[in-house]
Amino acid sequence: DSDDERRLSVVLEEDAEVIRYIKPPLNQLGLFYKAAKQYNPDFLVETADKKYMIEVKAANQTDNEDVQEKAKAAIKWCECASQVDADGKTWEYRLVQGDKIVVGNTFKYVIGMAIPVVVDGE
């Protein structure tokens, strides 16, 4: 785990709008990309109105092809999860640049700084 992820954990712990969060165990989500490789996001976060899949990356890694392929697969996973979520909440994916995570900021602020991901055809 990176220091960026540690700082995000602190933000999540301190934000009253965050109901719960987890760092998912390896290979538990069934999230695949590129020739059956498994992707494990850094965090799953629930707020009162939404659920989020969060990936934290260093600024110099956000444009990496592998990171972008994982992001596209995660966006599709979130679209499917939104349709069957038992709580009726929408799932959203966020790619967060590690240097944008500052202890003391809110979770909403952190995800507002997320890197846009373009899915083919959109």
Feature roles, as predicted:
Residues 1-122:
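Electrostatic, structured charged patches in enzyme active sites and in nucleic-acid/phosphate-binding
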